[in-house]
Amino acid sequence: MDRNSVIGFALIAAIMIVWLQFMKPEQKLGLEKAAASREAVQKTPAAALPAPSAAVAAAARADSLGSFAQASVGTEKTITVSNDLFTATLSSKGATLKSLVLKKHLDGNRKPFNLISASDKGALSMLFLSSDGKKIDTRDLYFRSLDAKTTETVTGKEKLSVSYVLDVDATRSIQITYTFTGDSYVVDYDLKLNGFGSSIAGNEYQLDWDGGLNYSEKDQVDESHNAIASAYLGGSVVKLDAKDAKKTWQDEESGKAQWVAVRNKYFVAAIMPQRTTDGIYLHGTKKDGSDFKNYVAALKMSFPAGQQSVDDHYRLYVGPLDYNTVKSLNADLEKIMDFGWDWLTRPFAEYLILPIFNWMNKYVTNYGLIIIIFAFLIKLVTWPLSLASTKSMKKMSALQPVMKELQEKYKDNPAKLQSELGRIYKEAGVNPLGGCLPTVIQMPLLFAMFYVFRSSIQLRQHGFLWVKDLSVPDSVYHFAFKLPLYGDHIAIMPILMAVTVFFQQKITPNAQSNEQTKIMMWLFPAMMLFFFNNMPAGLALYYLMFNIFSVAQQAYMNATITDEEKAAAAMQVAAATKPAQSAKKGGKKK
């Protein structure tokens, strides 16, 4: 490999490392706002305290909930709804969603898990300030279920509705209806407020998703990096990351929102309104010493002035971050998926990598094979560039003696040296950066594949050969400590990939051979080993196979470049260097 190629690869590796550490796509984070710290309330055994009288308890409820106090007493009843994709548990206390277990996606230990973290109070709630100044959270109120069954099943295109009603008094009521479809992650959520025109202060209520999603992966630190609250309004994505346990993170913005959501690495819970919103509210906290981030994502909805009742419709999506699935919702929910820079890597991910992968998956079920085929296709596309690069490097090699003479002759005149070198490069048909051009062109693709492989659920828990999960490193041994840059494990795929990098350099024509090039021939594979050790195994597999195809391609080109082509190149180089050689002879005569 020539010096330019080595330098190009080294720069690429350096850029990748810096990019991963410091150059993550800028996120529109929530504004920091001062918030009073919440002290944990220690539960005291009931036997240790005297039970309050019924009158005292009623007075406390009335003081807290006002006219809604009567609804805060009741018996909780649950109903379990099962469709083709998940099993959900609804509660009459709050008419809320308490559990949702996916059927086709397991956690890192390959066991079913509940996505909803707020399983005690429930994830969904309506919040508002009553006309008498009471903060009302519907999860504190007992609804009446209109379904007598405790379990329901719906399949295929069938639909099933579960309704709850809360009669506040003779003129006011709240009705909440969930409608499930057998083959969909989408749940229709209908909220009817009857007779509330003068009961809600400010004519506004919030529909909240309370609680971050439970983590599903073994690597909790990595998943924590992907856990955010988000919203889409005004044509842009708002992201709030509660990354610092010492702060409370908030963002409150006005405008028309298409959705609010919370997500972990591979799953998302989103609320999509069907009428214009007043704005959004995001809130996030993280406990010190814990990787889990807790969020609230809320839509702010106005109560139409002059109306006594409102009937609002929402769509809930609680399920995998599958690009095609969330895009089919036509709500721009796919914008929550992190594919890097919108102007560079995201187009590669959305319009090249994912469509090709999805098309190939119709005929090939193993994603390891799909990655290999994809690497082969990319190599075919870059073949002309590689061929031109090889020919250019052979010419560069032939030019080395003359270039050294010119460097010696014009060592005190850099401008003249560059002028002469430029003339020779042009007349010889040489591009001095041709050696690294194919690699530079692939950089956006490689970065986009990094994002796709680490965040797309398509590769999750899909194996290939010894690799159990292509979306994470193929670790075969874990250390009791962590090595800087390398990590706390040994992965096989990066080792094989580094070996192919070495052989690719050995077989690639060098424009010049010096001590620096020899050092880089060993150093660069080591750098790539360190870099890829913590990358998804699928990405290392792609680069491994691309290198193998490159070695085969280079061997073929070395063997098939004809003597006539070599002679023509030599004549072109000789013609380009003739003026420099003539000048040298003329200097000797003097």
UniProtKB/Swiss-Prot annotation:
Spans traversing the lipid bilayer: 5-25, 368-388, 433-453, 483-503, 519-539
Task: Check the record and name the CDD domains matching this protein.
Answer: 5TM_YidC_Alb3, EcYidC-like_peri
Task: Provide the alphabetized UniProt keywords.
Answer: Cell inner membrane, Cell membrane, Chaperone, Membrane, Protein transport, Transmembrane, Transmembrane helix, Transport
Give its localization. Answer: Cell inner membrane
Q: How does it sit in the membrane?
A: Multi-pass membrane protein
Q: Which GO CC terms are listed, alphabetically?
A: plasma membrane
Quote the Gene3D superfamilies the UniProt record gives.
2.70.98.90
InterPro entries xref list? Membr_insert_YidC, Membr_insert_YidC_N, YidC/ALB3/OXA1/COX18, YidC/Oxa/ALB_C, YidC_ALB_C, YidC_periplasmic_sf
- The answer, when asked if ATP-binding is one of the entry's keywords, is no
* Any one GO molecular function term: membrane insertase activity
Q: One of this protein's GO BP terms?
A: protein insertion into membrane
Q: Which Pfam families match?
A: 60KD_IMP, YidC_periplas
Q: What does this protein do?
A: Required for the insertion and/or proper folding and/or complex formation of integral membrane proteins into the membrane. Involved in integration of membrane proteins that insert both dependently and independently of the Sec translocase complex, as well as at least some lipoproteins. Aids folding of multispanning membrane proteins.
What does the similarity note say? Belongs to the OXA1/ALB3/YidC family. Type 1 subfamily.
Show the PANTHER family listed in the entry. CYTOCHROME C OXIDASE ASSEMBLY PROTEIN COX18, MITOCHONDRIAL, OXA1
Subunit info?
A: Interacts with the Sec translocase complex via SecD. Specifically interacts with transmembrane segments of nascent integral membrane proteins during membrane integration.
* Name of the protein: Membrane protein insertase YidC
Q: Which gene produces this protein?
A: yidC
